Curated annotation (Swiss-Prot):
Protein name (record): Venom nerve growth factor 2
Annotated keywords: Cleavage on pair of basic residues, Disulfide bond, Glycoprotein, Growth factor, Lipid-binding, Metalloenzyme inhibitor, Metalloprotease inhibitor, Protease inhibitor, Secreted, Signal, Toxin
Family to which the UniProt record says this protein belongs: Belongs to the NGF-beta family.
GO BP of this protein: cell surface receptor protein tyrosine kinase signaling pathway; modulation of chemical synaptic transmission; negative regulation of neuron apoptotic process; nerve development; nerve growth factor signaling pathway; neuron projection morphogenesis
Cysteine disulfide partners in this protein: 139-204, 192-234
Function per UniProt: Nerve growth factor is important for the development and maintenance of the sympathetic and sensory nervous systems. It stimulates division and differentiation of sympathetic and embryonic sensory neurons as well as basal forebrain cholinergic neurons in the brain. Its relevance in the snake venom is not clear. However, it has been shown to inhibit metalloproteinase-dependent proteolysis of platelet glycoprotein Ib alpha, suggesting a metalloproteinase inhibition to prevent metalloprotease autodigestion and/or protection against prey proteases.
Source organism of the structure: Pseudonaja textilis (Eastern brown snake)
Signal sequence interval, chain numbering: 1-18
GO molecular function, one term: toxin activity
Length: 243
């Protein structure tokens, strides 16, 4: 009986010794482990290549400001917006080319060809002839047509987006604003020209007004009153006498 038990135990040990070792029990540095490492590195490299290709096919989204400007350029303005001329200002002009240096005092205009532009300049010269009388203003001002105004403050004090280009009846017009401001941004110590500095304090400054301009609200164009530079004035105050 004891011999039979010894024989079974020996046969069992021989079977365990002869059984092949699994890959999970292979020691570090063996050929099986090297194959697994190579396979893992290859899969990681392929994953990185796939990620780079995906990024190239799907670029990063554009900024919100760029999208807003692009959408504003594609907005088609309804011609009905220009039928009511009640609040239109002579300081706002829609034109396909740069306007003349002097503004017309009539109303909002559309200049779409050179003949119209030349007629406007001739009419302005005939209406306001130049006189050399040595006339001087109390403040030196400068007036320009502003072509690329994109931001402004509305009548409620909120920032709004101003439309630069207006697509109307398949024609692209640019919105111009005639602005007047003080030529020197820094106040002059001597004050305004022609003011008695012995009795008055004076300085030149720029004042603003509201004009009706075409602005962008969401994906639609709408009229709003915005604030622009309108004039250069002299501010004076009486000097207090010290006794």
């Amino acid at each position: 009986m004891s011999m039979l038990c010894y024989t079974l135990i020996i046969a069992f040990l021989i079977g365990i010794w002869a059984a092949p070792k699994s890959e999970d029990n292979v020691p570090l540095g063996s050929p099986a482990t090297s194959d697994l490492s190579d396979t893992s590195c290859a899969q990681t490299h392929e994953g990185l290549k796939t990620s780079r290709n995906t990024d190239q096919r799907h670029p990063a989204p554009k900024k919100a400001e760029d999208q807003e400007l692009a959408s504003a350029a594609n907005i088609i303005v309804d011609p009905k917006l220009f039928q009511k001329r009640r609040f239109q200002s002579p300081r706002v002009l829609f034109s396909t080319q740069p306007p003349p240096l002097s503004r017309d005092e009539q109303s909002v205009e559309f200049l779409d060809n050179e003949d119209t532009l030349n007629r406007n300049i001739r009419a302005k010269r005939e209406t306001h002839p130049v006189h050399n009388r040595g006339e001087y203003s109390v403040c030196d001002s400068i007036s320009v047509w502003v072509a690329n105004k994109t931001k402004a403050m509305d009548i409620k004090g909120k920032p709004v987006t101003v439309m630069v280009d207006v697509n109307l009846n398949n024609h692209v017009y640019k919105q111009y604003f005639f602005e007047t401001k003080y030529r020197n941004p820094n106040p002059v110590p001597s004050g305004c020209r022609g003011i008695d500095s012995g009795h008055w304090n004076s300085y030149c400054t720029t004042t603003q007004t509201y004009v009706r301009a075409l602005t962008m609200e969401g994906n639609q164009a709408s009229w709003r009153f915005i604030r622009i530079d309108a004039a250069c004035v002299c501010v004076i105050s009486r000097k207090t006498e010290n006794f």
